[in-house]
């Protein structure tokens, strides 16, 4: 099981315009034996224009390729007044190709320095608005060139990430080159000098909205000289000299709104501003620690003034802006948007408030102290974000959705979210709203809404709500998007939803499997986020038997192997290996195990991934090899590709690794050791000492799996002797006596039984007489210790009263009681080969009575009807004619009492089984 939450990350998309040519044929009338075709070129132009406006750029290009008339309409400047290039690779060549369409371009949104450099090549002299994000690398030279080429510019916004390379020099150039500038918002500048601000005051007489956000230093006095300002934001700016600021800002004659959120302002400064500034109507001071220290502070005495702070009710405060506020609607934003008679001045204020609140809430959500504002988020923050998601301003909608995706995250790396916040979003109708945004034709909204849905879906209750509202189909459709950012977030949503067993089949039925596989083929290189999320979702889906077959049918095996072989991104490698592990984990219920092994390069790639420097990659690769080793051909191929050496090396280096890695490397060695040749090779490579060390682990999964590996290895006399010499007997005896896991104790007992069934004695005698005598003494002591522990282990499953009665009775009810008392449920997952079963049947005739009892106890575990492979084991015994030998052993006078009782149960089990299962794989564990 795995999932992932995401916060806002920097990424650049890759854009490719696909322009297929379609033959569009429609039936107009269906008269008998007559069929007429619609002439689509005769559609009214306004209808065609409406179609174009509802499409993204890529789909516009496809539609325009339909015919010459539509190609001409598709190039109309009416459709190219606004461009959002954030999701595309916008470079010089693309700028040149778009230039002829952008003569009348008025608004552009871009992402990153490469796109910024290319803007001037659009030759859009009439450009009015420029908005850019991920601007950390943009320099003064680039920004100055943009300003110089667009003298009609009225709005320039760069952020919310920091513009670290932009200085006051660029601001001066903007002021000089763009005299019509009305709005300027820049984030993260180090210093904003007085000269730069005074240049704005001098050359930009219409400048009414100014924001220097998250800056280090600004000149407070100079800001007081920009007398045209109606709205000023210095949110997040450090080192503000409040005395100087107050003296100058309170005199600004037109200042209506001031945003000082996330600054060091205190209640004294707030009171002075609200009292002294005659024009000021709205003061936003969210997340201001010094202001919030005074718990008794109230702004009620400042009539006609609105204070937005953590301790005020934002909706009530904003209601006072409206003339008729007696009803005070619950959601003032919805009330304002629904007003029939609009007030231009109020609209201007509310639009600014939407922008600054959405920006501040996102910044708070991203900050480390977000958890300290839990009451704020639960009481009004979540509701504010949902309200802002309904804004008419697209950037506000996106920022609110991003904030929603971020504020619920507690720990990104460990996929942990705040359940209270997530459920608050759900209670306020957030799921339905997000899904509506995800259906928008605007790809920016699709991306941010999908991200929020993905993060919220970490919570099981929210995931259920998403599914019930049709969210799975929405995400599956978005995963097919040609916009990489949209597809990436949608894949993340499917990844998180696919954790729930109840959602897996729904995802497959919605076409999610095909969409996820196609993503890997569509973006095989340089799109790490897409690949990791698609592979992660497929890994979760592959854990389900039916869905795993769907993944295979969709070409998932080939896609995942390609990813494991060629991708260099560790996150994608890890998820690809996990997906292959889960595909191979269904044993003989489907053919995926063999299919993965037969895929060219699969086994070799997984062996190579066990040598990755990244622990997660090594862990999942080892897990995949563990499952694949169930297949005889896979097992030998893994060894041929150096799997034994690689896994032994990994085991040797895993002493300080995670328990997950330790378990999987032990499991992979367990699976490979089924083969006698591999078993010997593991011993020769030095695999026994690290496995003994893992047997001593306190983690049940680790020591249980390591004991299983030693069980297989111990059948070889040479390995058995190595286990003795390396102190393995003591480790196994301790495990057999103290582990909480019955399964671990059982396998430790079986390993000890194999070691001391007499075959090792002859092997140990090889060498000089002195060495042989020494070995004999050592073995005798180890044998006594081992047999005593095996006997004690079996006794723990023998209740005196039940066994006393069982020895005298063969009544089914009595034998059922004994069987239930002796049963180890986990042992039902073990699947033995015919030779393995034969070893235990042979052990029934061993001179050692303890080993006879151990063999009978093991055969009981393998044939209990409730066990997964009981029918298979019964079939092996019946086909080999073992029933007669079992009856003879059960009737032998020398057979211990407990062994006789166990054998009665085994014979009864055989009578109830039908020989239907073919011979399968040998002893090992199946895991998902």
From Swiss-Prot:
| Repeat region (ARM), residues | 147-186, 237-278, 303-341, 370-409, 419-458, 460-499, 501-543, 545-585, 591-630, 632-674, 676-715, 717-757, 824-864
Q: In which tissues is it expressed?
A: Expressed ubiquitously.
> InterPro entries, alphabetically?
ARM-like, ARM-type_fold, Armadillo, F-box_dom, Leu-rich_rpt_Cys-con_subtyp, LRR_dom_sf
What keywords is this UniProt entry annotated with?
Nucleus, Repeat, Ubl conjugation pathway
User: Where does it localize?
Assistant: Nucleus
Q: Which one GO biological process term can you cite for this protein?
A: lateral root development
- For this chain, the annotated S-S bridges are none
Q: Give the UniProt entry's GO cellular component terms.
A: nucleus
Q: What does this protein do?
A: Promotes lateral root initiation and development, independently of auxin (IAA) and abscisis acid (ABA).
Which family does the record claim for this protein? Belongs to the beta-catenin family.
The protein's name in its UniProt record: Protein ARABIDILLO 2
Which organism is this protein's natural source? Answer: Arabidopsis thaliana
Taxonomic path: Eukaryota, Viridiplantae, Streptophyta, Embryophyta, Tracheophyta
